[in-house]
């Protein structure tokens, strides 16, 4: 009897212990599940990229007027029976005969960013076909023929789109310059796969499950079966730089600066057109069309026939082909070739190519403005990053004279002399002096006494000039030529900018600022010795007894006459001020930023505000004031605005 009672007690105890263990295990499993779900949610939230999807409103009058410059075509697509050509200045619509019908300008109807790709697609979340447009710095824009909408990532690096590929599911594959390959599914924007991040993507071809990804310097990646294979020069690729990819069935063709690599079922086969710089590819039936940099358009038989490629347009303007496209899926349909300077149609009879349309002509030579000035005669001087300069006559701006040679090539600064009428131009190949008529008179370089050939800035100094270079300073006046550099106490040899105020000159360098009185260095300012937030000084101007300094990464700062620094409320943070993109007028201070637009300070209130509407690019590079206007240069064109329109 006692043994039976004890057995029951032990049984009850065992059941209780077992139940407790099961409960404990259940709690642990439940908690583990919660943690796992939380981790997955956190990982998903971290991998997803925040973005804004918005409809672009019709433009308002921003006050900015364009100074016409050449439009560089980048790509084209057919849509609703018309041709749409995308380029640096915007989107241009043409009817079937090549006659212009509408145009949509960047900074007006479109975001202030060059357009780089365009294609037709039906995206997830949309019920109709649209033109899908890739931009250089404003994400993705879609257009249904009447309304534009934008997909703008919060991450600025994800806004620089380099390639787009719509898929059959309605997803959009997006190649970027710094964030690798992204996928947009209509609701979510995220990296395509962890192995394809941090790439500079140049081209996309294939499908979501069998995808070829071209890169700037890492060859080509083949995504298939949930994994990726890489091919570079060691695997048969003629060059690690990839500019074009075309896919048909199991075959893929990868073009670059040294020819075309052919792949079959993911395996390298051979090199076609060796030595040709191939920019774009199109497969038409049994023929591979290759648009090249210098060899026109090549027609290459896909079969192993041994026949040499057929060439078109090796002479004349049919060069530097940006895109080849067909109007339909049939090889007999119309074929188009897009270059920077025009669009060409293939002659169905003779097989050659004829010009169909071209971009609007411009007054200026180039769009990448690096320096501006208005001289005492009212002429506008426009310096370019790599195309010399234009001298624009009169306020009506109807005629421009172009100057470009071995010295007047990369222009950094233009300084007119109001007394003599002469103009000094700082270039990467010397200091070039022009007379009052705008004729080149003299080139001064290292051989003539400068400390370096590369001149970054010029400022008035006594009865002459002070010249900034990456190797230090050179003073040129009636006493002759002499130089200063770090050995003499200059804070850093690499001088970016100069600002003169009476006997004082402030030199902004890569390593801080130096204040000179005459040719004597009176003080140096760095982050270690002052309240300066960044040593890299890119721009400087004298103002109200002190100085304003622009930096590369810490915005603007004011230095008073005693050397005390104050950060600028509203224009500090991580702002990058472009070299010498700082100007003061009687009413305001203007600062040009890298990727953030134009910053304006009202001198009475001291308040800064940003201006982006009406600009052709958010990379503002130069200013000039004259003829009743403020001229604003960017890396994508020049605009002007009456100064009072900038007041708020």
Model-derived features with residue positions:
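Carboxylate-rich, polar loop motifs that coordinate divalent cations or form catalytic acidic clusters
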Residues: 2-648
